[in-house]
Structure formats: structure tokens, C-alpha cells
Regions:
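Domain-level signal for soluble alpha/beta catalytic cores
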Residues: 1-367
Length: 367
């Protein structure tokens, strides 16, 4: 039976962990002390998720600054940039501190990306757990800096390097016994959003070509990963998530048939927490054998969703895809960026996960 409930990956960092990380940055504690604080926080998060009964747990991404940081720390050839960028919150545009890495030299892996996280989970999780990684198509598009390093003459050439690095990492994770690997790609939402496509064109990048190059990189990775151990593979199509703000809007329909049909994944995690995500009609393109995990629960607002409303939306979705191929989750992480946590209290975070479990029992039990 497929997993009926999960969350995207990140959880709100507890105060003690945030303090330990500040102390480490200031030189007041050593790496071993920080690691102990991380371990304690992860164990507490596992206990909380177990108590709720969610089908798949994570370590909350507590050891990361954001969803890309593990990769960036594990390779050479990148420089970090911090800048102000325009995000959206409600009907307003807001300025959010963002960061990105740019390629400035040969990208080679020098350390594990997530294997240390996975080993701790393998020793301490009592139910299936997942490990999240940024997708190669996304990081190649975002990290490419034209003209800074000649051997990477194009995004596609850089993507080949990240496909190889992430493929090696996933093989190591599978050997460690990781049951579920999720790729995160906020880049696909660019191609749903007219304004984002216009900005991409203004930079001299053809949006349709960029989409197909991104898709080709992610497909190349997913076609190379080990399948013999029954590992679950998923893609999360993110619309941006930082301090309760977001970046992209639009229906999935313009890319759904090609996107959903091209990637050999077991699960597609799709954001559906408000009207900017469009309707469920695109679910007709989800291939047989793939589960659509509907992100109906918002990590951006404190209000805990009503099971009745969630049941209604699951019913609406089942008009386009068999109900047995649905699952339920929040739309994105609760703290994709450790310093840009969403405006949700920890109690509300876990209440939202509990509502997901309750709703799933009511919708799926007996089917």
C-alpha cells in the first residue's frame, strides 16, 4: 500500500538548535557540540512525527542551512552570493534575503552530501524515512554563471556534472538502506509563471529550451539510480518557500503532460495550498503507477486546516485520477531556509501534520 501521508522535508528548527548554530558560528562551541545539539533535535523530531503517525518521517533537514546547502558544502568550485530578491506574500511583493551559489571552477565532490544524515536516520527512525536532495536540473540552471569557467560552456554541460555527483550520492544512500529519496526542484514552477518566463527571456534564455534541458538532466539522473532495492523516488515541484512568501504561480497544465510523463518517479509532490496553483485537471497526466501527493496543507499560514475542507478537495482531485493514487502532505517545507522559517508555530506545524493523518484515514480507509 502506498504512503498516504508525508511532509516535504524541512521542519521548524527548535530554539536550542538555532542557539547552538549561532554559538558555533561565533566560535563559542565546537563541531562536536553542535553535532550533539543536532542529534538531540532530530531525535525529538522523530519522536514527534512517530506520535502523530505520519507514514514517512525526516530529520527536519536540521543539519542544513537550506535545501541546497548540503550539496554546496560537499563540492568544490562554487562561490556563495547573498542578495535581496523579490518574493510575493499575499497580494504584495516583498524583499527577502536570498542566497545562491555560482560555479567558478571545476565542480568535484569532496564529502558526502546527505549520507551522514541518512546513517543517523537509519539507526534511529522506527518507520520509513526519506532523504531530500536538490535536483541536478535545478542546481545547474541556478548555479551556472556564463563565462566564469570555460569547461562549462552551457547549463546542459554543467548539468552532466551534477547528474554524476548526485547519482553517486543516491547510490551511496541506497547502500545505507535509505528507503525513499526525494528530489526538490523549484525551477519547474518558473515555466508556469508568465512573469518568470518573461524575466528568463530578458536574460537571453529561451524558456522552452531551459525547461527541456532541466527535464533532461533530472530524467538522466532518475534513469541511472538503483532500482533493485525497492527504493521510492519522488519529485517535489516547488513554487518557492521563504519566510511565508513564495515566488511562482500558475496552473501546472502548460508543462504537466511532458513533466509528469517524462520522469520515472514513484511519487509527484505537487503544491495545491491556494488558488494560485490552479486546478486538478492536470492530474490526468500523472502516469499509471505514480502517486500524486497533493500539498493541500499550507506551511505558510498558522491556521490549521479543516479535515472537512481537505476531504472535499481530495474528492475533487479524484475526478481526474484514481483515489488510490493520491496521497496528502503540506505543500512545502516548514523551514526550507533555516533563517527564513515560515510564520507558523511549532505546535501548529505538528497540528497540521496530525490533520493530514486524520484526513488520510478518513479518506482512504476502507477503499
Amino acid at each position: 500500500m502506498p504512503f498516504r501521508t508525508e511532509h516535504v522535508g524541512s521542519l521548524l528548527r527548535p530554539a536550542a538548535l538555532r542557539e547552538a548554530r549561532r554559538d558555533f558560528a561565533a566560535g563559542a562551541i565546537d563541531a562536536e557540540t553542535l553535532r550533539a545539539a543536532e542529534d538531540d533535535a532530530v531525535l525529538a523530531a522523530l519522536r514527534a512525527q512517530d506520535a502523530i503517525g505520519i507514514d514517512v518521517v525526516t530529520d527536519g533537514e536540521f543539519r542544513r542551512a537550506d535545501f541546497r546547502a548540503g550539496l554546496a558544502a560537499a563540492v568544490t568550485g562554487l562561490r556563495e552570493e547573498v542578495f535581496d530578491s523579490a518574493w510575493r506574500s499575499g497580494d504584495s511583493e516583498v524583499t527577502v534575503k536570498s542566497r545562491v551559489w555560482r560555479v567558478e571552477g571545476p565542480v568535484t565532490q569532496t564529502a558526502p552530501i546527505a549520507a551522514d544524515e541518512a546513517a543517523f536516520l537509519a539507526s534511529n527512525a522506527s518507520v520509513p524515512f526519506k532523504v531530500t536532495l536538490p535536483s541536478p536540473g535545478y542546481v545547474a540552471e541556478r548555479f551556472f554563471d556564463p563565462g566564469t569557467y570555460a569547461p562549462y560552456a552551457s547549463v546542459a554541460e554543467l548539468a552532466e556534472t551534477f547528474v554524476r555527483i548526485l547519482g553517486d550520492e543516491i547510490a551511496a544512500l541506497v547502500e545505507l538502506g535509505v528507503p525513499y529519496v526525494q528530489l526538490d526542484n523549484p525551477g519547474y514552477a518558473t515555466f508556469l509563471d508568465g512573469r518568470a518566463r518573461t524575466r528568463l527571456s530578458a536574460k537571453g534564455r529561451d524558456p522552452d529550451r531551459a525547461f527541456r534541458e532541466m527535464l533532461a538532466a533530472d530524467r538522466a539522473l532518475l534513469e541511472s539510480v538503483p532500482r533493485e532495492h525497492g527504493t521510492t523516488y519522488a519529485l517535489h515541484v516547488c513554487r518557492g518557500n521563504n519566510a511565508s512568501s513564495w515566488q511562482h504561480e500558475g496552473d501546472y497544465d502548460p508543462v504537466a503532460e511532458e513533466l509528469f510523463g517524462s520522469l520515472p518517479v514513484d511519487r509527484l509532490l505537487l503544491e495545491y495550498d491556494d488558488e494560485r496553483s490552479g486546478g486538478f485537471e492536470c492530474l490526468r497526466f500523472v502516469p499509471a503507477g505514480t502517486v500524486a501527493v497533493l500539498g493541500l496543507i499550507s506551511t505558510k499560514v498558522a491556521t490549521v486546516e479543516s479535515p472537512t475542507a481537505l476531504l472535499r478537495r481530495l474528492g475533487q482531485a479524484s475526478a481526474y485520477i484514481d483515489a488510490d493514487r493520491l496521497a496528502l502532505s503540506p505543500q512545502c517545507g516548514f523551514a526550507t531556509h533555516a533563517d527564513g522559517a515560515n510564520a507558523v508555530a511549532t505546535d501548529a506545524q505538528y497540528a497540521k501534520l496530525a490533520v493530514a493523518v486524520e484526513t488520510a484515514h478518513r479518506f482512504f480507509d476502507g477503499r
